[in-house]
């Protein structure tokens, strides 16, 4: 929903041709069977009855949103999917918000938000905005990495949010929250709006 609000504010489409997001990659110029959902999520629909799909990942490392497998970029990949799955890959240095209600689309998105952090690199900062129903931003979460420390800070109103460090199964410690394990990676439950995570 935030991407739809941004499209209204800035004019950049929510569903983007690959060449729009990766203008310097010649391989993206003619791709018409996959697209970017916003600036960080790549979607490759399955057009084959057998479930076979070929798709191209631009430069970098990409993580599947649900399966959590990692694939290298700058190359083509071939996979098989069923009716309940498809390639949905997330770029590194992405902070993504997942909701906590799969029964209806309209609810308080800032309550129980499950943030997902995908491979934040040294010196990089990731940001995620959670919208209210009117499209305005009700909560903004930022994560910045310096060395082995990730500083996380939130601004605005949010309740019961968590942060999952995708494909990181162990951390040295956390200040400002508690940690638990999951199949996707360490999940940190925030006690306030700031966290300091030591990898």
Where do the model's predicted regions map?
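Catalytic core of carbohydrate-active enzymes
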Residues: 1-158, 162-168
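Solvent-exposed beta-strand/loop surfaces of large extracellular or lumenal domains
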Residues: 65-83, 173-193
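Secondary-structure transition/turn motif
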Residues: 153-159, 189-194, 198-199
């Amino acid at each position: 929903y935030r991407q739809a609000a941004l499209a209204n504010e800035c004019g950049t489409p929510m569903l983007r041709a690959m060449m729009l997001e990766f203008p310097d990659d010649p391989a993206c110029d003619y791709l018409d069977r996959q697209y970017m959902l916003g600036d960080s999520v790549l979607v490759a629909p399955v057009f084959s009855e057998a479930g076979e799909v070929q798709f191209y990942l631009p430069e970098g490392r990409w993580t599947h949103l649900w399966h959590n497998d990692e694939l290298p970029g700058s190359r083509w990949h071939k996979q098989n999917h069923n009716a309940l799955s498809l390639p949905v890959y997330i770029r590194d240095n992405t902070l993504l918000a997942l909701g906590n209600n799969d029964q209806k689309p309209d609810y308080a998105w800032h309550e129980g938000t499950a943030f997902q952090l995908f491979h934040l690199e040294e010196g990089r900062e990731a940001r995620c905005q959670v919208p209210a129903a009117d499209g305005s931003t009700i909560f903004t979460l930022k994560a910045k990495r310096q060395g082995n420390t990730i500083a996380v800070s939130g601004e605005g109103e949010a309740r019961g949010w968590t942060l999952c460090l995708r494909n990181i199964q162990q951390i040295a410690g956390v200040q400002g929250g508690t940690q638990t394990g999951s199949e996707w990676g360490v999940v940190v439950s925030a006690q306030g709006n700031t966290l300091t995570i030591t990898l």
